[in-house]
Amino acid sequence: MRYVLSPQADADLVSIYEYTITTWGVDQFHLYRQQIESAIQAIVANPLLPRSKERNDLLTGIRLFRVEHHYIAYRVRTDVVEIGRVLQESMHFETQVSDDAFQFQ
């Protein structure tokens, strides 16, 4: 299985990484990026990870997986994990996870 990032998820990651570098420094950026990348690889290896949570109330088929202070919002298709958003834990998921977040180019 493989994964794809939506344009919104890609923008989320850029924002997270820029904030981390500015606020916490390059060393923390490298650590956090590795944690997020490891989480994505774990999701790809087992999309129904016990630590993931089904959130059909947000959008049918959506799961959330927590990484430190962020949640990866994704859904599983036949041969691909679609990552729609990477959201800060304090965000209002109901307004951030929508069909628009899962548009892939």
Where are these regions (language model features)?
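Basic/aromatic recognition patch in beta-strand/loop cores that engages polyanionic ligands
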Residues: 50-81
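Enriched for short, Lys/Arg-rich terminal
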Residues: 70-71, 75-105
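Residue-identity detector for threonine
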Residues: 20-23, 60, 78, 95
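Basic, Lys/Arg-enriched alpha-helical interface segments
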Residues: 2-58, 103-104
